[in-house]
Amino acid sequence: MFSFVDLRLLLLLGATALLTHGQEDIPEVSCIHNGLRVPNGETWKPDVCLICICHNGTAVCDGVLCKEDLDCPNPQKREGECCPFCPEEYVSPDAEVIGVEGPKGDPGPQGPRGPVGPPGQDGIPGQPGLPGPPGPPGPPGPPGLGGNFASQMSYGYDEKSAGVSVPGPMGPSGPRGLPGPPGAPGPQGFQGPPGEPGEPGASGPMGPRGPPGPPGKNGDDGEAGKPGRPGERGPPGPQGARGLPGTAGLPGMKGHRGFSGLDGAKGDTGPAGPKGEPGSPGENGAPGQMGPRGLPGERGRPGPPGSAGARGNDGAVGAAGPPGPTGPTGPPGFPGAAGAKGEAGPQGARGSEGPQGVRGEPGPPGPAGAAGPAGNPGADGQPGAKGANGAPGIAGAPGFPGARGPSGPQGPSGAPGPKGNSGEPGAPGNKGDTGAKGEPGPAGVQGPPGPAGEEGKRGARGEPGPSGLPGPPGERGGPGSRGFPGADGVAGPKGPAGERGSPGPAGPKGSPGEAGRPGEAGLPGAKGLTGSPGSPGPDGKTGPPGPAGQDGRPGPAGPPGARGQAGVMGFPGPKGTAGEPGKAGERGVPGPPGAVGPAGKDGEAGAQGAPGPAGPAGERGEQGPAGSPGFQGLPGPAGPPGEAGKPGEQGVPGDLGAPGPSGARGERGFPGERGVQGPPGPAGPRGNNGAPGNDGAKGDTGAPGAPGSQGAPGLQGMPGERGAAGLPGPKGDRGDAGPKGADGSPGKDGVRGLTGPIGPPGPAGAPGDKGETGPSGPAGPTGARGAPGDRGEPGPPGPAGFAGPPGADGQPGAKGEPGDTGVKGDAGPPGPAGPAGPPGPIGNVGAPGPKGSRGAAGPPGATGFPGAAGRVGPPGPSGNAGPPGPPGPVGKEGGKGPRGETGPAGRPGEVGPPGPPGPAGEKGSPGADGPAGSPGTPGPQGIAGQRGVVGLPGQRGERGFPGLPGPSGEPGKQGPSGASGERGPPGPMGPPGLAGPPGESGREGSPGAEGSPGRDGAPGAKGDRGETGPAGPPGAPGAPGAPGPVGPAGKNGDRGETGPAGPAGPIGPAGARGPAGPQGPRGDKGETGEQGDRGIKGHRGFSGLQGPPGSPGSPGEQGPSGASGPAGPRGPPGSAGSPGKDGLNGLPGPIGPPGPRGRTGDSGPAGPPGPPGPPGPPGPPSGGYDFSFLPQPPQEKSQDGGRYYRADDANVVRDRDLEVDTTLKSLSQQIENIRSPEGSRKNPARTCRDLKMCHSDWKSGEYWIDPNQGCNLDAIKVYCNMETGQTCVFPTQPSVPQKNWYISPNPKEKKHVWFGESMTDGFQFEYGSEGSDPADVAIQLTFLRLMSTEASQNITYHCKNSVAYMDQQTGNLKKSLLLQGSNEIELRGEGNSRFTYSTLVDGCTSHTGTWGKTVIEYKTTKTSRLPIIDVAPLDIGAPDQEFGMDIGPACFV
């Protein structure tokens, strides 16, 4: 319900917006009242009858005014409220019984012309609210429409009659007859000519409610009624369609600091901050668990030459060779772990002021202007000739009784006419006895709203309304400024074991430790050299299958799981203090015009601006999709107030307000024409006979009085509630670099770098334990000392040193040449406002704007202070009938009527002839109240009223337009160091390292306890300059440099086109009152006046109350991205951060040179039997057996050394012995291969994870696997990452050439096109090693997926003028690629998070004409989705759009 208070609130809001424009912030103060501290601008109620506001440190309090004389016997008072009230069912005893409806009066004289109202279109009706409580009784209603003719009146009214009799023609009046019984109502007669105005009849009873009439024209604005009680809250209306954009208003003042918002979710990753100083070394940790076997130590100092030993072990890797030339770009690496989110970057530079936006569409007409000063009354015009009878007008209010006409001559007696109307009231009879109290009459028709009463005191603060329904989610906020450091977190879990430190200095020798427990069995020794092959033995019989192997060891921990869902939003953080403003940065390039914002709140009507040139209408862009909600950013600083929106359309008429109290009696109006004869009133008590007066002449209707002058402005109202935050302004100028932050904690793990070249040999280690004495070799001759070697190739560059201190600022550069004349600039923004000009002429009424859709109902705001009096609103629709109003003032005494018949009410006998006037009687009891007098003609405008009480805060405004860019904020304080991140998962294998020098073989020592980390070594000498490496990835943005010197002024550009009209200034102060001119006829439509100067800055208003949050508006369309500003000068280097953790392992190094010969291997298996020996010597002469071949028990002192199944002499070795030996060795080898497969073609493993578990020290590389087991002929070759246990299957064709693959038949119709399915020469991706059967690979992949819990794959999309993921122009992902998984599921860039991929690098965001690349990564636990078999780009099809791809391996673990 739009009440009087609402109107005042709207005006007060508008006034506050003007007053606060341009004023500086007042420092926040608070008030202390009765020990209670209250923030500035806050209101509170110390008790129910007192309301206070804190205004700049002073508590301003006012009592709640209550109506003093309540018209009911038992006023009631609610708990917690100050004012008593009448119960709703109470009816005032003064309510009079209303008589029969009076006759219809003639139309009143034409009123003065009202100001032209804005013809608004009706809005869509909202859903009806719940009914409010009944209002107080209204004033008396106007007289009802009368009956039609005397013939009708003669039939009377009978409740029970149903028939209708037709009236006869009107005859001459006969003598007055007795009152007849009530007749049936007659039918509606035709409209007769209007009669002379009759005496006003008494009020009739309330008629039945008629059908609703057609909507009338908008009447003149009526006085605003007193605010009614608020109704119960209606259900929220439906979300309206988005309104048309309004004209941008002037930028508003910077608003007060907003209250702290809730802590947002973590913002987007900012660029990396400057590297902090290295942290101090931590304390020594507790000794870790025993580590794996260490690498061989450096070569010891040369000992004296010993005798030549046996061949040593393979040597260590040789020193680094010179770096090789940069190789071609490899296929995409294996997916790394997702990096931790970086800290928020510094605030960007402020962009330059953008050009003036395009002219908005014409707004709806503004509200009517304030009434101008009244002219003096014009001279009386000549009386015009009588016009023809007009069509019957709407019944006017009854006029005052006209002067009585002279009696006409007596006419001839006519035939008796039908029964006449009841006669005029007779001379008053003597006072009769008091009649019995009548039944209460029915409620009368609701009267029109009474005139506005005097302004009441401030009402009690209402209770807060119920919470509204949650609004739709708002748009994603821009990244907020960096928050204050949070409280220290709880101690994190123990981090992983650090890397092994460099050796510390040797400690003092410890006391001997206790004897250790027996060590575990050592790892199997390295495989010995293969023995020379024996001659082939006979094929053995197939042995029985061996026993099943033991279960393998448990695998290593899997990689970190997928990122969890976002946690619950935390509690709001404490309010941050404002940073000092930073220096202004350089002006950026103008950005493109922003998208039109949502319509703002109605602004004050400004002076008419000069018409600007009409711009061409642009096509409406398509609605962008709603982005997925981002994590909520930290609260941004309060933006400047949004620009004022264009005026809204005429709203739907509000519900009828509760009738106001009866106004003071108006001055007497001029007499109206004679009305139709009214029905008889009830007989009054008999009065004294008065002497007849002389008839006065009828006067002419006077001209309407001149309107009064405009009242003095009211007191400054309280400011309205804080408006919703405007849309983020354009990017501000870039602030200066902030002060150097405190040293950061060690950064999170970096992405694992490529394997660096092998470093120079470290310092000599402590002497190792003495090795076991080798077998003495023959002493070699001492060699001569070698000549010094040539200087080696320059080593690789050393690690980057710590950054030096920033250099001194350079001298300003020489003044540059003047630039070429620029192209004609866009129209600039409006200049600053000039001083207030005189008021311009009233402009034409604007065309009605298009009808806006109804917005959603906002939640109720807190009750504000009363607003200033609003302008008169248009009349509302007729209300329902109200109860009878209070009695009107007593009417002026009418002229004496002719003597009537004896009324039925008199008890005395018939009335005698009139006697002489008697003495004055006693004062009679009050007569029944007369009917309400007709409204007089409007009097002159009264003098201005006193200033009203400070108004309540206005309703919350709609969301403003984006404000102008705010000044750059000062760099935030350095945040606390973040906790060290956990170590990331191992990266992919690096390239082979260079071969190292051979080390001497040492005896394998027992593992020592882990030493404490040594101190950092001294920096090495600077190496020679290396060759230029390939370009690295773009670095983090440097801190902004100091601003350069101001350049010379450029030449003047061409004169720009006329800019659009500036926004209207506020209404100037009223001029001095001029002499009144005569009222002229309505002039022709004037031309649009020139634009007035902008008004002066108003006073600052009080702080408004904090309003509840408004419903979020519907998201606007995605604006185009602004042009990038020029890169700032390079900032000084930051201090070096603490060293990050070790990067991931590099790729395998190249194969080193062959090591020295290994130790002699174990004895090989016995060879096959040799050829038969030569014949033996002759046997003994006897013919007996040689018992030496039979099994003999071993003898302690056997002379011939006979053995059990063994013979010392080679000649007597049995073939059977060799066969058994060979078979046993072969079987044990096969069993060992089953239990610990080698990953070779003949002995494939099941997965790389199995290989890693059995051979944890093996290097990453290519191995053979057979996931389905069985025959090994279908084994496939894969890449095993031995650090992670991943099994990676490469595509058979890993790259797609970079060229134009597709020309679209319809370039405007963009759709996804599958590379393998729909493009000429395209193909679906197949996987496996070279020469493998695709069917075998498919089966093996099926088994591999079953044995894996996670899969990942990267694809690199090379692009030229083709968007792969994010479209920089629209900021959305609609043009992202589609990927097809092995199970034919489509993976997208946006949508359901279960089927979306992410990007590691996104260099294909716009059409630049150069090649870029986007690296796509997809990780999933649904292993059946990988590998990817097809890709569908969308942004292709034009001749200049080209692409290519690198397909990475699919890795399973």
From Swiss-Prot:
In the record, which positions carry Allysine?
K160, K1197
> Which compartments is it annotated to reside in?
Secreted, Extracellular space, Extracellular matrix
Q: Where is this region: Disordered?
A: 97-1206
Q: What residue spans carry the Basic and acidic residues bias annotation? A: 218-232, 1082-1096, 1197-1206
- Low complexity bias: start-end ranges: 187-206, 307-320, 335-361, 368-418, 527-566, 623-650, 685-695, 703-716, 773-787, 800-815, 842-872, 901-910, 920-935, 997-1012, 1067-1081, 1102-1148
Glycosylation site positions? N56, K254, K1097, N1354
| Sorted UniProt keywords | Calcium, Collagen, Disulfide bond, Extracellular matrix, Glycoprotein, Hydroxylation, Metal-binding, Phosphoprotein, Pyrrolidone carboxylic acid, Repeat, Secreted, Signal
Q: Which residues form a coiled coil?
A: none
Q: Where is this motif: Cell attachment site?
A: 734-736, 1082-1084
Q: Where is this region: Major antigenic determinant (of neutral salt-extracted rat skin collagen)?
A: 1176-1186
The organs and tissues expressing this protein are described as: Forms the fibrils of tendon, ligaments and bones. In bones the fibrils are mineralized with calcium hydroxyapatite.
Tell me which Gene Ontology terms the entry assigns under biological process: blood vessel development; bone trabecula formation; cartilage development involved in endochondral bone morphogenesis; cellular response to amino acid stimulus; cellular response to epidermal growth factor stimulus; cellular response to fibroblast growth factor stimulus; cellular response to fluoride; cellular response to glucose stimulus
Sites where Phosphoserine occurs are at: S161, S260, S776
Q: Which residues form the VWFC domain?
A: 29-87
Here the disulfide bonds are C1248-C1280, C1288-C1451, C1359-C1404
Segments for region (Nonhelical region (C-terminal)): 1182-1207
User: 4-hydroxyproline (modified residue): where?
Assistant: 179, 182, 185, 194, 197, 200, 215, 230, 236, 245, 251, 278, 281, 287, 296, 302, 323, 332, 335, 362, 365, 377, 383, 392, 398, 401, 416, 425, 428, 440, 449, 464, 470, 479, 485, 503, 512, 518, 524, 533, 536, 545, 554, 560, 572, 581, 590, 593, 611, 629, 635, 641, 647, 653, 659, 671, 680, 692, 704, 707, 713, 719, 728, 746, 761, 767, 788, 794, 797, 806, 812, 830, 839, 848, 860, 866, 875, 884, 887, 908, 917, 926, 935, 953, 962, 965, 971, 986, 992, 998, 1007, 1013, 1034, 1037, 1040, 1109, 1112, 1115, 1133, 1148, 1154, 1169, 1172, 1175, 1178, 1181
Q: Identify the residues that bind Ca(2+).
A: D1266, N1268, Q1269, C1271, D1274
Query: Could you give the domain comment from the record?
Result: The C-terminal propeptide, also known as COLFI domain, have crucial roles in tissue growth and repair by controlling both the intracellular assembly of procollagen molecules and the extracellular assembly of collagen fibrils. It binds a calcium ion which is essential for its function.
Q: Which family does it belong to?
A: Belongs to the fibrillar collagen family.
- Oligomer and partners: Trimers of one alpha 2(I) and two alpha 1(I) chains. Interacts with MRC2. Interacts with TRAM2. Interacts with MFAP4 in a Ca (2+)-dependent manner.
Protein name, as recorded: Collagen alpha-1(I) chain
Organism field: Rattus norvegicus (Rat)
Source lineage? Eukaryota, Metazoa, Chordata, Craniata, Vertebrata
